[in-house]
Amino acid sequence: MEKCIKEQAKQLTPSAIKYLMATAQLCSAGEGARCVDVAARLNVSKPSAHAMIQNLCSLGLATKKRYGIVRLTPEGEAQAKLCEACYAPLYERMHAALALDEELCRSVALNVLSQFYERIDELAESLNTENTAYPMKEMYSL
């Protein structure tokens, strides 16, 4: 998995991480999600969601049949869980300590994840988040 993380680190932008986590949340019931659901969740256009889902598929983090359901691969699920475990504490700490605007905190937390993605295991450990679950629904005003 470490090799995969290093290969993907250069390609996982803050936006890709956001889509990965949103897709994971939508797929949590085990039924998968549609691009239109991801678009609605993130308040983006359907073409934008489709393009980013295709990007996640090309990285081996998701699968999608034409006009079908999006599902995360086991690697995608693992990466999404790791990102979620880091995202929420980063967001909460910045929001509490710096009193920044919520949207700015979201953006900065995603940028931190993207910049330190190669070392995300260390980041998760340092944030002491191994057994803490933070629902994405609270992070995004949906």
Predicted regions and their residues:
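Short, hydrophobic-biased segments on the C-terminal half of alpha helices
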Residues: 53-54
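N-terminal helix-turn-helix DNA-binding core of bacterial DNA-binding proteins
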Residues: 3-44
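A short, conserved structural fragment
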Residues: 57-67
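Basic, amphipathic "hinge/linker" alpha-helix immediately C-terminal to the N-terminal HTH DNA-binding motif
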Residues: 68-86
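Alpha-helical linker/hinge and terminal dimerization helices associated
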Residues: 83-97, 101, 119
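C-terminal regulatory/oligomerization modules of transcriptional regulators
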Residues: 107-142
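Key DNA-contact positions within bacterial/archaeal DNA-binding proteins
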Residues: 47
